[in-house]
Amino acid sequence: MLDIQQIQSIIPHRYPFLLVDRILEIEEGKRAVGIKNVSANESFFAGHFPEYPVMPGVLIVEALAQVGAVVLLQSEENRGRLAFFAGIDNCRFKKQVKPGDQLRLEVEILRARGAIGKGKGIATVDGELVCETELMFALGDKRAD
């Protein structure tokens, strides 16, 4: 299990764009399960939508991508690198995510060859499918400008 400080030591995302609160399970380089506690205070609810707050689907996908980044960047060989979101296939949204929901984020790395790879992401709330997708990634190094 990884807490928020440990997650922040692995991926560079920070508020308001850090969308993973905890990693519950992790198998290095293979898979992870994380959670996002969706609060009524999330900044995106101010505009999406004020009278009917719903978490934007693209942010659910981003939360899955961040869990995938933890899987990839936790390994010693990838420490300090960045995982870039390189593509998405077969994305489907099945249920809305609202304030008070706990989003369970499961990502399995399907293949990784060099700096390029693909993972499968599944997001659920209370055991019900919210989103499933395939995510492509590219690993890169931080540039010193």
UniProtKB/Swiss-Prot annotation:
The active site is at H48. It comes from the Bacteria. It holds the Pfam family FabA. GO terms for molecular function: (3R)-hydroxyacyl-[acyl-carrier-protein] dehydratase activity. It is found in: Cytoplasm. The keyword Lipid biosynthesis applies. SUPFAM superfamilies: Thioesterase/thiol ester dehydrase-isomerase. Its main location: cytoplasm. Keywords: Cytoplasm, Lipid A biosynthesis, Lipid biosynthesis, Lipid metabolism, Lyase. InterPro entries: FabA_FabZ, FabZ, HotDog_dom_sf. GO terms for biological process: fatty acid biosynthetic process; lipid A biosynthetic process. The keyword Cytoplasm applies. Its EC number is 4.2.1.59. It is an enzyme of class 4 (lyase). One of its GO terms (cellular component) is cytoplasm. It catalyses: a (3R)-hydroxyacyl-[ACP] = a (2E)-enoyl-[ACP] + H2O. Involved in unsaturated fatty acids biosynthesis. Catalyzes the dehydration of short chain beta-hydroxyacyl-ACPs and long chain saturated and unsaturated beta-hydroxyacyl-ACPs. Belongs to the thioester dehydratase family. FabZ subfamily. This is 3-hydroxyacyl-[acyl-carrier-protein] dehydratase FabZ. It comes from Geobacillus kaustophilus (strain HTA426). The lineage of its organism: Bacteria, Bacillati, Bacillota, Bacilli, Bacillales. The gene is fabZ.
